């Protein structure tokens, strides 16, 4: 939607790394290896900041996103203000530290014996007891509500991750990859909301899901009280970035459109 240069200020914090560390990981994600943590790197997209902030408000775990400066010759592996950089022509991307914790088994949506991705009910059936099943279902429904509000178009096997703890309880891992959202032009002509766990083909499909999972209705209604522009401003301010006025107008319009959609769903 915009370049990082439109948003930078002298106070913007940038994490500096050396370019030679950059490579593809096993999932073809660009990443940088450090001695302590792996950093996933992608092109600048401020929707990641907003998705993260919405997750914080809704108590949904998410990846943390920050600016990364690549091929900087001094003071690597630390944050530095943009005004303090000797070379301000460096390549600035978006980064997030690997959120995986030791002792937990992380996995993506599994395939069944017919080589098809398993559905919501099948992933829930992997839970060891009813308590864990209900916990995981609530976590997934909260993801559904967030994504519907944000207009997420690609919540699929590449960006849905789960983890299993030492008690074999299964939970949704932190959410990440919000870049295909907050943009009406990205809307699929086939799906209102595309998720590999459950296909919401239209509003009626969502209503049918709500008839047996009322939590989705309440979660969607909670977004009617959220001001997307305020969320965007907060997420930019926390990173000492400026938000272009044209983008503010876009977020205001998008917020209005999504709230009209939610009202149609929950009425």
Cite the ranges covered by each PLM segment.
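Conserved kinase catalytic-core segment
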Residues: 43, 120-187
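C-terminal catalytic region of ATP-dependent kinase domains
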Residues: 56, 163-267
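Short, structured coil/loop segments at alpha-helix boundaries
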Residues: 37, 45, 76-82, 89, ...
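Short amphipathic alpha-helical segments that mediate assembly, nucleic-acid/protein binding
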Residues: 116-120, 133, 216, 258
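Conserved ATP-binding subdomain of kinase catalytic cores across diverse folds
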Residues: 1-111
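Intrinsic structural disorder
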Residues: 1, 15, 134-135, 267
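A broadly used, surface-exposed interaction patch
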Residues: 103-127
């Amino acid at each position: 939607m915009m370049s990082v240069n439109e948003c930078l200020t002298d106070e913007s914090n940038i994490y500096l790394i050396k370019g030679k560390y950059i490579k593809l990981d096993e999932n073809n994600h660009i990443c940088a290896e450090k001695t302590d943590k792996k950093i996933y790197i992608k092109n600048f997209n401020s929707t990641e900041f907003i998705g993260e902030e919405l997750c914080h408000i809704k108590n949904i775990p998410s990846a943390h996103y920050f600016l990364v400066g690549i091929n900087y010759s001094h003071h690597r592996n630390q944050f530095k203000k943009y005004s303090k950089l000797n070379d301000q022509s460096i390549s600035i991307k978006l980064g997030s530290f690997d959120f995986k914790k030791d002792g937990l088994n992380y996995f993506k949506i599994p395939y069944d014996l017919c080589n098809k991705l398993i559905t919501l009910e099948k992933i829930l059936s992997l839970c060891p007891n009813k308590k864990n099943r209900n916990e995981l279902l609530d976590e997934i429904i909260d993801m559904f509500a967030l994504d519907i509000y944000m207009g997420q178009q690609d919540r699929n096997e590449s960006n849905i991750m789960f983890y299993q703890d030492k008690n074999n309880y299964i939970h949704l891992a932190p959410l990440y990859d919000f870049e295909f959202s907050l943009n009406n032009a990205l809307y699929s002509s086939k799906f209102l909301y595309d998720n590999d766990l459950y296909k919401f083909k239209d509003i009626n499909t969502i209503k049918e899901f709500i008839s047996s999972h009322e939590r989705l209705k309440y979660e969607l209604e909670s977004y009617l009280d959220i001001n997307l522009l305020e969320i965007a401003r907060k997420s930019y301010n926390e990173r000492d970035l400026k938000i272009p006025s044209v983008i503010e107008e876009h977020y205001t319009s998008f917020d209005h459109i999504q709230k009209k959609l939610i009202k149609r769903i929950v009425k």
